[in-house]
Amino acid sequence: MDWLAKYWWILVIVFLVGVLLNVIKDLKRVDHKKFLANKPELPPHRDFNDKWDDDDDWPKKDQPKK
């Protein structure tokens, strides 16, 4: 087990290379042209930030300084 304490980083590199090869292999299977041709429509983005727009913290130019 002394070799494992000395060379643990080689096992990590082998693992990362394996993960990288699997990612590349899976990405080659993706057909981006087919996906873009049949891309589903996204619904409009809804956020509720418009309520915050009424609460303006900036001072108005017409108001005199207090």
Curated annotation (Swiss-Prot):
Residues 42-51 have a biased composition (Basic and acidic residues). GO terms for cellular component: plasma membrane. The keyword Transmembrane helix applies. Pfam families: UPF0370 (PF13980). It is a single-pass membrane protein. The keyword Transmembrane applies. Residues 39-66 are annotated as: Disordered. The chain crosses the membrane at residues 4-24. InterPro entries: UPF0370. Keywords: Cell membrane, Membrane, Transmembrane, Transmembrane helix. It comes from the Bacteria. It is found in: Cell membrane. Belongs to the UPF0370 family. NCBIfam families: PRK13664.1. This is UPF0370 protein YpfN. The lineage of its organism: Bacteria, Pseudomonadati, Pseudomonadota, Gammaproteobacteria, Enterobacterales. The gene is ypfN.
